[in-house]
Amino acid sequence: HAALSFLEKNSMEENLRHEMELTAYFINGILDLDPEEKALKVIGKKNIDNRCAVVSVQTPEIDMARAAFELDSEYGIMTRVGLHCAPSAHKTLGTYPEGTIRFSFGPENTKEELDKALSALAKITGLHHGEGIKNGF
């Protein structure tokens, strides 16, 4: 019943638009933090055309499981980490065997939560606050 009530207030189109805005915001936030993607890399397309509200990242210098554990234990940010039951896809993407950290966004997420995640990623990866960062770190 709660799901139906939610959908009566918010159309599927509104939810999708919101989720894709968050996806673009998060990708742009990562690219603002690390334009050359040396410490934090977006895996896959850098735009929202033909994608869903999921963003996978890789931190080449830090173990993916360690980074995901720190996101959870230190910042309360839940992610999924690893090969996501798709090792062949990760081989194709060049992220095997480490995998990625996967963030997904839903209709209840906010830009403030994404700012918290971006700030946590900046701290974990050692990225420093610098010019070009637009999300207020």
What are these regions (language model features)?
Residues 1-137:
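Pyridoxal 5′-phosphate
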